[in-house]
Amino acid sequence: MSEKASDRWHGIERPYSAADAARLRGSVHIEYSLARLGAEKFWRQLHSEPVVAGLGCMTGNQAIQTVQAGLNAIYCSGWQVAGDANTAGEVYPDQSLYPVDSVPKMVERINNALLRTDQIHHMDGKKEIDWLVPIIADAEAGFGGNLNAFELTKALIRAGAAGVHFEDQLSSAKKCGHLGGKVLVSTGEAINKLVAARLAADVLDVPTVIIARTDADAADLLLSDHDPRDARFLTGQRSSEGFFYVKAGIEQAIDRGLSYAPYADLIWCETSKPDMAEARRFAAAIHAKYPGKLLAYNCSPSFNWKAKLDAAAMKQWREELAALGYRFQFITLAGWHALNLSMFELASAYRENGMLGYSQLQQREFAQEGAGYRAVKHQSFVGTAYFDAIQTAISAGSHSTGAMAGSTETEQFTSTVKSGPKRVVA
């Protein structure tokens, strides 16, 4: 971050100076290579590609499959971390109940998986795929106040996140955007969280992409009535807990989006249904004041898509949204649903047909090799040959304990497929 604005920082406001960030940085410069690489790559994608599409991944292997299949970003969902991938080892609903280090640990896990895959392919001279795609991480409502948001952003950058998003809910009452009982903080408090995230990125000297999410379309409770920007949405009623009732809806969401725009790189309005007219209205209102402002859209599994849209509309949905400025689109809980359905289907087939049920899955894996799928050869996939190469280098080629030679995979899993389709990320 410099005093002189560059194209990267066009339209972004900071209530602090470059000198403030430098003073907080310390005397030792630490380079966060993965976070910087991802942030710069994500920013280029947002400005050079019609749409950046990502799936929510909850394991490193899901991330590898996502990149292998040709997608160019990964979303790290707090819901999925709560549901089955948190450091407490618990199953939680999406209410910020998990330990605060859980999403950073998931980002690190995903980056480690992508790095290992890159190492395996680099060793074999395969360079057709750029495995290190940007990871956009869910910082929820910041797990507290401004300082909590500051520290969480730093942890996500250290883990290698390219972008982070913060929502405008009250952290202690945070809910999934598609649950009831959501409480908004004041517009000013939400802005302070965005400033805290930006300051954290500037202190670590990484151009992290900051996304502001508003839940104001559905949230009808407000923590405090002190901010004049929120006044026109107050109903005059109070809840039993002392919260202020507000008029939820797209007007409140637009007002929040306009307030957040100077402090965030993208704006995300959490919606309750896939509604193109509503998406168009939100985009038009933001762009009337902030032309070209980048937008994000959650293509949520909480929507019953077939009940809302026909096949043609679903097929065109992504491109129509992109034309409105929604350049980053993602399916938040894709990994959770894919994991659960695939395991249920396998268990059902195995119960009914024994090993035939498993073999049918294996044959589907073989059939996908032509498209680039590699996990059917699980020993190679996780790097057995890579670690054989390390052993060979250490012993100058004189060892008899190599793992791949003599393996059942080498003997039984031959293939004529050399590689999948090429996909290069700039």
Where does each model-flagged region fall?
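N-terminal phosphate-binding or glycine-rich loops at protein starts, especially the Walker A/P-loop
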Residues: 50
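A contiguous, mid-protein "functional segment" used to position or interact
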Residues: 338-374
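Alpha/beta enzyme core
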Residues: 6-33, 37-45, 54-303, 307, ...
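Short acidic/histidine-rich active-site segments
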Residues: 331-336
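C-terminal functional modules
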Residues: 363-426
